[in-house]
């Protein structure tokens, strides 16, 4: 029962009491009314208390029920929330997986697009490089065409001037011819007069008189003819000299390449001075192995952050430089590693030499050379003659010979080829017996070069015996290249020749595998074959080599001969 029901009940009871009092009449007294009212009040209070108690019970029950409902609702809500959260997590995980998958797919697509873009960029860069090279080539061709046009214009002017001179000479010849005709007529008149006088004075017959006159005229004409021939020869000699000087001047003006005198020492930078100890190795084993394998002196002194490589042979020195730089870069320096790196450097040197040969042929404008000849040509990069780099000298001779051949109307390409190959014998003259001319002739014939090239190689030092004009042109170009101030130096060449002679003497003995002239020619290290030279024979060999050097060479100070005999036993653990 609710509180409203209790209030209504009290009102009904009150009204009932009032109505009861009215029906029973007025006879009841006020005391009874009050008693009734008091009883009604007590009853009402009891009812009210009961109602309140019941209300409290109901309220408590309602609270308990509400609490239970709330707990149930909370449990259901929690379950629903957990279910919703689980569903959300599932959907979120699915969405994340889908997003991750799409991201991966997008990443793959992006990576592929990036690779395509990089490839496209590389292709564009390559195209730009090709375009740049093409522009440079076209620019060079335009410049060459411009120079060729100028040269042709100058040549046309020279030809016009020569034609004018020829016309003047022709007019002079016509005048001289008229004068000669006049002289002939005068001579005829004189002859008739002489005949008449002879007839009158000497009483000679006409035949005798004619014979005497003709003999006299023959003598006079012979003298005049000899004088004219001498004058014509002198004019031709002067004209040829002027033309030759003009051709040489044009060739020298159009060819002005640099000269480079090679040295016998190479400086190799090192990261720090602490690296010098690692290069030397324990008890000097690293430096000994390096010098024995390369034939180059490795000089370690007080020079900060640098070591020196000394050798008269530029190829050995370059191989040593490449090997040392690789060892410094790698950091592992020990005899077996040194042997491996030196062998690798030798292989790389072969490629480098071939590339230098190709570049030289391209620069000289010579095509169609065989690979073996290109390899030999590249070796000239490391060859010097009186301090002048032979490869640069050969390129210069090729250009000069080509220019002079073009001026003379000869095959400029063939002249350039002959000029480029005229010193090819110097590429192997240290390994093969014979002069560089003889070696060059043999190499040119071996590789099937034209006879003009062979003739130029054979006679570029004695053009008087040449069979073709190309040998004369090459000889002139060779003299021009070598005669320029500063192009050659005598002292360095003599020094290199002395070192080569030391090695050649050591290599001439049987059982010698290789020999190196080191310490600026103060020491010769001879590596012998251990199966042919014993320890006792090694001592005798050193004495024989020293005696031969004393007899055949002139040198300052003394030369130490060191014979090295090494025996190796190698086995592999498997």
Swiss-Prot record:
Its EC number(s): 3.1.-.-
Family annotation (SUPFAM superfamilies): Eukaryotic type KH-domain (KH-domain type I) (SSF54791), HD-domain/PDEase-like (SSF109604)
EC class (word): hydrolase
All residue ranges annotated as the KH domain in the record: 264-327
Molecular function GO terms recorded: RNA binding; RNA endonuclease activity
One BP annotation, GO: mRNA catabolic process
Keywords assigned: Cell membrane, Endonuclease, Hydrolase, Membrane, Nuclease, RNA-binding, Transmembrane, Transmembrane helix
Pfam families: HD, KH_1, RNase_Y_N
UniProt-listed InterPro entries: HD/PDEase_dom (IPR003607), HD_domain (IPR006674), HDIG_dom (IPR006675), KH_dom (IPR004087), KH_dom_type_1 (IPR004088), KH_dom_type_1_sf (IPR036612), Ribonuclease_Y (IPR017705), RNase_Y_N (IPR022711)
Domain HD: 390-483
Subcellular location(s) of the protein: Cell membrane
CC per GO annotation: plasma membrane
Oxidoreductase found in the keyword field: no
Gene3D superfamilies assigned: 1.20.5.2950, Hypothetical protein af1432 (1.10.3210.10), K Homology domain, type 1 (3.30.1370.10)
Domain of life: Bacteria
Membrane topology: Single-pass membrane protein
Function: Endoribonuclease that initiates mRNA decay.
Protein family (similarity comment): Belongs to the RNase Y family.
Protein name in UniProt: Ribonuclease Y
Gene from which this protein is expressed: rny
